[in-house]
């Protein structure tokens, strides 16, 4: 618009077609699942330079994740008797809907202290419709993708990059996050439903629960990363680099059910060190220590929705010491 104000925008038109011929579980029945999707998405942002060192911005983005077909899903009630099962309403359907997001963000980027400190700060709000998640049906061994009608996410991200002296610099990154399922929605936790088998589908259906007010999956409320860097050219002319790092990952829920025995993943903090030395113009040496305190932590976990109800846990790596010798040709 002028030297201080800029408008950035872009749009995307998507056409998506899928078709699935599903025949499973002894081939007793076959389903042809197909659909066509069309969606227009885009982004618009306004940037404003307050001065030569400071820029603010405001943006709106509409995003889209296409829907699709499930390989397993609840039997329609009309088909229940063909399999000797008791009728129960479906919770997982042949087709799951497209997920959409309206994302709002406001931010500030500025250089301070004669450009020795850079600050990047942003606040955001995301509104989801038909959020896709892994769900379970009352029918045995039937799970797939379902949709949560409405949910929200809001947060704040702060980043500082600073020069302390000719040799020392640092970076600090903080993120704060709040999430919530805002619509009334009932889903079946397969951890609870696993106690019941063929012929007990109506009982499984009664175990469905409202997840309104629950937190979204895999969304830590607080993350932090701090790094202190040292870099110096020695009297020999060789370059020496050293880095000390602290990484904190906050606790979160691994599923939208927020089951305290299965879904709660604890926070952890780890410490890392690295040292790099330029032996010659072509040879370099790196010494690295990761997770120095040998912290026990869970990186992620996943609970199967297709019948066995098992939960797999991915742990963070234990304490590690590594050395690396490099040669530049």
Show where each model-derived region lies.
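Transmembrane beta-strands of outer-membrane beta-barrel pores
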Residues: 13-19, 60-66, 75, 112, ...
């Amino acid at each position: 618009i002028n030297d201080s104000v800029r408008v950035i925008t872009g749009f995307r038109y998507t056409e998506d077609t899928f078709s699935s011929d599903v025949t499973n579980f002894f081939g007793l029945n076959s389903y042809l699942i197909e659909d066509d999707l069309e969606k227009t998405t885009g982004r618009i942002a306004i940037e404003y330079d307050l001065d030569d060192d400071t820029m603010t911005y405001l943006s709106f983005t509409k995003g889209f994740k296409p829907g699709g077909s499930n390989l397993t899903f609840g039997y329609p009630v009309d088909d229940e008797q063909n399999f000797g099962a008791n009728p129960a309403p479906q919770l997982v359907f042949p087709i799951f809907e497209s997920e959409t997001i309206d994302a709002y963000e406001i931010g500030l980027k500025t250089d301070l202290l004669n450009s020795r400190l850079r600050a990047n700060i942003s606040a955001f709000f995301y509104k989801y419709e038909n959020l896709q998640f892994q769900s379970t049906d009352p029918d045995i061994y039937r799970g797939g993708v379902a949709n949560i009608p409405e949910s929200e996410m809001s947060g704040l991200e702060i980043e500082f990059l600073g020069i302390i002296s000719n040799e020392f610099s640092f970076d600090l990154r903080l993120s704060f996050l709040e999430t919530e399922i805002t619509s009334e929605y009932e889903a079946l936790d397969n951890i609870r439903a696993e106690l019941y088998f063929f012929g007990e589908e109506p009982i499984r259906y009664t175990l469905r629960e409202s997840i309104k007010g629950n937190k979204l999956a895999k969304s830590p409320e607080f993350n932090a990363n701090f790094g202190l860097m040292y870099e110096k050219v020695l009297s020999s002319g060789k370059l020496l680099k050293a880095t000390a790092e602290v990484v904190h990952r906050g606790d979160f829920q691994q599923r939208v059910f927020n089951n305290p025995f299965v879904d709660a993943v604890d926070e952890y903090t780890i410490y890392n060190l690295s040292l790099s030395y330029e032996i010659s113009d072509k040879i370099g040496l790196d010494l690295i220590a990761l997770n120095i305190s040998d912290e026990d932590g869970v990186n992620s976990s996943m609970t199967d929705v297709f019948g066995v109800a098992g939960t797999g846990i991915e742990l963070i790596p234990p304490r590690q010491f590594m050395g690396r010798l490099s040669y530049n040709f």
